[in-house]
Amino acid sequence: MLFDQIASNKRKTWILLLVFFLLLALVGYAVGYLFIRSGLGGLVIALIIGFIYALSMIFQSTEIVMSMNGAREVDEQTAPDLYHVVEDMALVAQIPMPRVFIIDDPALNAFATGSNPQNAAVAATSGLLAIMNREELEAVMGHEVSHIRNYDIRISTIAVALASAITMLSSMAGRMMWWGGAGRRRSDDDRDGNGLEIIMLVVSLLAIVLAPLAATLVQLAISRQREFLADASSVELTRNPQGMINALDKLDNSKPMSRHVDDASSALYINDPKKGGGFQKLFYTHPPISERIERLKHM
């Protein structure tokens, strides 16, 4: 059951990443069609930009993300309990010991980042360390170590980069349209254009406007799939499903983080740091904790 869930979530995540690349290609084609009279040229440029974004994030993610979240690095002397739990989980998972950080925040949360198991780090809030017992802390760190072992950290980083590239291209196109770039380039075509030309123009405009929203939803879907996988993988490491269930229950009752968490980092956390209601639920970076608990109960 556990390995079936892991395999299923991995397949779904790669499908979602493919959708990301298709969205990037669509925006690139639309921008190229509108502004340089070459949809294919725009597509190629967009894919190159996405590749550059992904590479830059992969090689710089750890320092950038930890700095953005106000995390401070600790060691065996300054945070022995957390350090030893992470060390134990890394040993069981057969990965190198990740760097360990603490975020001074009363909310209960944690995340992992990095480009690969050899260059990874985990962070936990001070609130989590104050509330969780040993078994629950092991479950949470097992969850984060699983993100590292399963290369979720790399996939999440690529997703952030591609979403940023799509948003950047759409924003650039919007500014160009504001200054009349598309109108000047296609004014003659539109004056005598046929139905197909008008349809292509409308579709291109819709792609530019809607692609960032679609990219956000795909990024959230990737995060949600990886959370299910990491929950299951944590149980595999600890052999203690009840510990994970108890930890999730405490996370569910935690308040939002007091410090500002940017959208790119939100998807990394074990618990959505920006809790809200109503329409905001559509943009939650995580599946409902009640659903995560139910899946664990039926493993």
UniProtKB/Swiss-Prot annotation:
Disulfide bonds, which pairs?
Answer: none
User: Is-annotated flag, keyword Transmembrane helix?
Assistant: yes
Any single biological process term in GO: proteolysis
Q: How is the cofactor bound?
A: Binds 1 zinc ion per subunit.
For this protein, the parts annotated as crossing the membrane are 15-35, 39-59, 158-178, 198-218
**Topology of the protein relative to the lipid bilayer:** Multi-pass membrane protein
**What protein does this entry describe?**
Protease HtpX homolog
Q: Please tell me the species this chain comes from.
A: Streptococcus pneumoniae serotype 19F (strain G54)
Q: Where in the cell is it found?
A: Cell membrane
Q: Which residues form a coiled coil?
A: none
Q: Which residues bind Zn(2+)?
A: H143, H147, E227
Q: Which cofactor does it need?
A: Zn(2+)
